[in-house]
Structures are given as structure tokens and as C-alpha cells.
């Protein structure tokens, strides 16, 4: 009889269901892991509610990709790990919202000692931010704006100030997230609901727009705001936030301002997962205290409530942890 497991599956736009599905078959060079903690991010919301119509339904296990897991079985040829080890499991296919997940050896990252599993789980997204920052021009002495202060934006604040930015200006409509931004390295904060962000930037930065702007929200309004904040001729615009759906972007402004523009995705395909390993080391060493962003926890059976909370960003939610069965 084929073994079964519980899993979530995004079956239609805005609709996910609990299902029973077949446990993956163990193959050479892979491990079967049991996800223990999963956190949600903007790309999960995109898959749930904003992917192209032709993408639905997604496969079983969708959608979860920030995962701490326990190794349950080792396939032939897999070395360096033992059954019972806890790992950060890289899940680029977003299919880890399930009781079991099949992972190749290169996507099993050992956890350093000294921090909780939930804290170390933040290394997955922090790693994507480190990877993105490696694509930026030098930020030493520069003024950088970060539009969007979810956890990705907060990690940008932290990394950019460590890289030597003279000013890190955090923008968001939520005051609780702006308070966190100050904890994580922002030199200035702007609540975009309370003041004109362009005027505020000019006031902060000697009547100049910023050298570099990072967009970390993926909304139409935030992307167009980021374009406005970048300095003409020399400004650099990094698009990190996942656009939720086809949007109207003022490309004419990118063109007439002669901006340098780069989008960044697929950090999980970085050879050796170097940036994610660096993120694990930063958290383990205490260089970054991630505990302040861990605001909510849900059991697996209430994951649909967690998605709703994440999508609406109510109750001062920042990072939501799902405790798997």
C-alpha cells in the first residue's frame, strides 16, 4: 500500500486545501525530510493569489519554501548527514508545506549551534537579501532608500548599514515596522501614509534624491515610488519585491531619469548556497537578533488563517511561523 501524508495544495486562485497525497519516493543523492517549521513570505502569497491563471492548480505541498526540517531517510550516495539531523532545507519548488519533502543533498544546510530553530529559519530570506546586495554597486558613503519594511526590507536595512551606507532610509505605511527598521539599521524612517516621501527624502538628503533604492514590497505603488526616489542619471534601482500581478509601471520615468535597473530572483540557485550559509553564520554569531520579527505562530491545521494574516498584514504581523505536525 502506498504511504500517504498530509499536505496543503493551492488548487485555484486564492484557494488552498488540505489533502492526502503520496509520500515522495526516496532516490539517490536525496533525503526525505519532515518539515518542522515553515515561515511565510511574499512569494507564497503570490503563488496563492496572484500567479497566472494557467499556473493553477499548483502541485501538492504548495506553498512553503522557508523550512527547518528533520532528516527522516537518507538515499544512496548521500553523505555528511544523519537521520535525525535538523537542517535548513532549501525548497525552490515551494512544495514543503507537507509532512514529508524530498530534498537533494546540496539543498540540506546544517544548522549551527547556539540559536533556536525558529531564529535560524530566518537565514533563508536573509540569504536572499545578502545575495541581492552582492548585485548592487558599492554602497559605501551612499544614501540608500528601502521601500517596504517586511522582513526582507528589514534585512536590507541591516545589511546595507553593515556595508557602509551613509544613510539607510526606510519607507513603509506601518509604524510598527518602521520602529523595527530603526532597530535593524535604518538611519531615517518615513511613514508614507503621513508625509510625502519625495519631500521627506529631499529634506533628509540635502535636497537630493537617493543614490540607490531597493524595492522590497512588490506592489504597484511601491515600485513606482521607488522609481521616483532614485536620483536622475546616476541612480540605481533594485527590484526585489515579487510583483503580485501584472502592474502599470512608469517605465517612462526609468527611461527619462536614465536609471540603472536590476531585478533579482532565484537566489536559491546560487552555487553552494553561499549567501544562505553566510546568513546562518550571522544569526548564530549573534550579529543579527532576528527574534523581534517573529510575531506570530500557527499550527499547520490553521495555516489558512496564517496566509490571510500575512496577506492582510494586520495585528502588527511581521514574520509568521507555521509549526508542522
Q: Residue ranges of each PLM-predicted region?
A:
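Glycine-rich cofactor phosphate-binding loops and adjacent beta1-alpha1 units
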Residues: 139, 187-260
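Mid-domain Rossmann-like dinucleotide-binding core that forms the NAD(H)/NADP(H) cofactor-binding site
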Residues: 119-194
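Glycine-rich beta-strand-centered segment in the early N-terminal region that forms part
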Residues: 24-39, 51-93
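A structural motif shared across PLP-dependent enzymes of the aminotransferase-like
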Residues: 92-104
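Residue-level recognition of short, solvent-exposed, well-ordered loop/turn junctions
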Residues: 27, 82-83, 104, 139, ...
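C-terminal substrate-binding/catalytic core of Rossmann-like NAD(P)-dependent dehydrogenases/reductases
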Residues: 202, 246-294, 304-305
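C-terminal hydrophobic helical "lid"/dimerization subdomain
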Residues: 2-7, 224-228, 276-325
